């Protein structure tokens, strides 16, 4: 409203008061108005023309306080609504008077927060008592069938018409509060005294702040047109509940429809607080951040109401669209004595080109104190929480406002800012805690990896190979994560290469094992006599093969006891152990012992024996033992162990043997024993090579997996067999007649017995080539069995 209009209205108001004092009407009886009798005697004070202003009933002039607020009122002066016509003609005013005279409560719909500068709060319930009595009288004569909004068209065109209201009557833009006030008046309870309206934004007028909401237009349009629009279209005060079919939009399509539900809250007015000055109290809504700032108030309290400084609310920067369908019978407010109401703040439709995120707005806390003359019997401490949201269809803005109101004091109540929202410091602390936990977990895993790698393990002793390869890391060096990861990678690669090599070696060993197993199975399943049984030696003369291998033909070693080891030889006395892996089918040939004995396997051996026999001829000897080759080779001289049927009769006669021949015979016997021991040793090693091919490369290693003796015992047995062979050859040399002539040999033997045994075995042994045959036989067996010199370890 422009200042000229405002000043003119103030002048009109003062003129009406002076006129009422100087020219009281004849119908105006102050006593009648004080006790509430006969209110129909005067014109309705809501709308009075310029000519009828002199008949306005005023009982007395209200006393004006220090700030221009009247201290007491009569019924006429305290009646809440006055219509001042400055430019309207008398006929229009009278027509309005005739339409509204029967509906005095219609004027409650009008709102103008900038005109009523002379009215103020009451300090008693005197006016409410009078208002209740007059309301009961008018309720019987008021006709609800008359449309209260018919007046809006005539009032809408009046530019200087201003309708004021008393600040203590409750106003609700949805009709709920007016309905509550009307019900209170008709039920003799009266409206809630000393109440004001609380919103999100406050402005201050010249001398008085009146509660209102700029619902349709901006604050610059807060004039009579604004008040008439609210009266004519938005608030269905009385017909909203009784006649829901009537809506402001149906009466006037120019007014906007309801799209959002606005809300205001009723708060009891606190006591006067002269310590607080509201001259600098301002609230602003920032378009960029939507934060509510209060420059004139200390934090966190953003506003405190008092009886002298009422708070008016508007939205100067945004337009508000109200909901189309207001609740009819809903009442969001509890009884006044509880003073605990929860409503939603008005929702504004904000047009903005920026894209905002969801913003939680922290609003201030407002504390108020109830008046002593209020309806509550005893003061009670209660708080009211009001939350509002501002949403925009174009940009996702969410704004919530929270008010905590204390009804019995002026101290602000509410939670601290840290409890409302997490501060950036607390968020940063939570983030740091998560990062610290992540780092500690990572360091633990790195430490486990360091202990798993041998080159990084604590207390690891490096070898020369590690130092040469450069894989050793000194313990004094501080390890970092990069070093640990690199060494772990190298260790994994080395394990992979070793694993690959072991897999290849395992394949080779599996192949060899299959070959050895097949050889052993072939030797055991041969149709000839098994080697195990041949080692025990079957008794008697077993006929052998006619075809003897060349390697066996070169051997001249053999005794009758050797037929247990080599049954396949042409003669048991001249056989050499044969590999059991070369079985041959037996050839049964009917041969006489004479024919078999005439077979000489080795020429050199025969020549040697012929020399011995020519030197020491023996005509006949029954003492020829089983180990004598001469008796077998020359049965005519020695007779041997032949059957009597095959030996001539003259051979059966006893013959004389010289002592020299007897010594020679004994020497030959010792020699034959030595040869037999060597042959047995060869057979024993051959069996071990067949049963344990892994140890075939070394002649000193035998894993006795088959025989029930340990490897150490086998080594001792082998050494004893060799020693026995040496002794046999030594005894052969010493017992011969030629040996007795060499006394120096005996002295050497007595002095160096052990050395003499080995020397005599290697030098003085006549069949020294037998050792060569033994080595050749062993090499032949190894080559034919496809046995390598050893297995790589």
From Swiss-Prot:
The modification Phosphotyrosine is found at residue 356. It comes from the Eukaryota. GO terms for cellular component: chromatin; cytoplasm; membrane; nucleus. The modification Phosphoserine is found at residues 344-345, 355. InterPro entries: bHLH_dom, HLH_DNA-bd_sf, Regulatory_TF_Diverse. CDD domains: bHLHzip_scHMS1_like. This is Putative transcription factor sre2.
